[in-house]
Amino acid sequence: TIPRGQWKFSADRGSVEMAAGFEPHRIYEVVYTAQDPVLVGLGPAAVRDFHSYLKHGDTPVAPVRRAYAFGTSQSGRFLRTFLYYGFNQDEAGRQVFDGVIAHVAGGGRGSFNHRFAQPSRDAHPYMNSFYPTDIFPFTDVEQTDPETGLTDGILKRAAETRTAPKIFYTNSSYEYWGRSASLIHTSVDGRSDAPIPENTRIYMFAGSQHGPASFPPSRSIGQQRSNPNDFRWAMRALLAAMDRWVREGAAPPASIHPRVSADTLVAPEAVQFPKIPGVAFSTRIHKAYRADYGPQWKSGIVTSEPPKIGKAFPMRVSQVDPDGNEVAGRHAAAWDGTD
């Protein structure tokens, strides 16, 4: 912590100055007392009410019988937040969305419903680590964190009101390394697979990145060229599968993802990545930490800033074969849309 007397806000209050200068390659974070927060939290209510109106209201504009929600990355985390707070029940107690597809959201939710929330913030290995995005609970089913004693689940409220939709969680390989995806289907201690509700499916696209690159792949900031492995064909098949599931009750393909019980979901240091010329394999991974934002956090008010940080949750990733390819998950070249 840098003493307050060694730095100051600039005249326009838009930047920070320090007489001694800033060290290169370090990330500085300013903690200060703010005022006059903008109104946040209306988004989930607006999404709920608009789709409830289309589905249940007396409207000749666009009457619908079934409503599906799809979100990618940040909007996927929005949908997990939407479900967690019970917004899939409208004010009349009716179900809003029949089906939800949260894509490449990993284990996160988001800053969409608390004072001074910044929706665009999401935790990464090198920045924004302690913003309230990757926080307990992670699984749809209720679990108890032995470290804090908290018991909760993403679908706790929806299960109580019988308004839980049918759900697909789809993730790329990256989300297991950079977005804590393993937490959505493991026990809190990471030693076993967590139960998955009948209304939920989890799919992992092996050997893929957060969003497929164009082909031929180009160089970016990474060690290797961007990954063009395209999972959008499978996403189209899953959309059709979701529609059949809701309309006809036809069960979609079973969940497919790395599992602790199959030794395909392991700690990063246990990955048996082969030695490949020109490839440097790193076991550095984004971690989700137990964070205490203060006694009013349940009401959406942060009173402990920075938060009090506890132990990290155990992160797990997919094991690889002798060629370095992930052994679990959906392999695009081998999947024809059936299970």
Regions found by a protein language model. Name each.
Residues 1-339:
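C-terminal His-loop and adjacent cap/lid subdomain of alpha/beta-hydrolase
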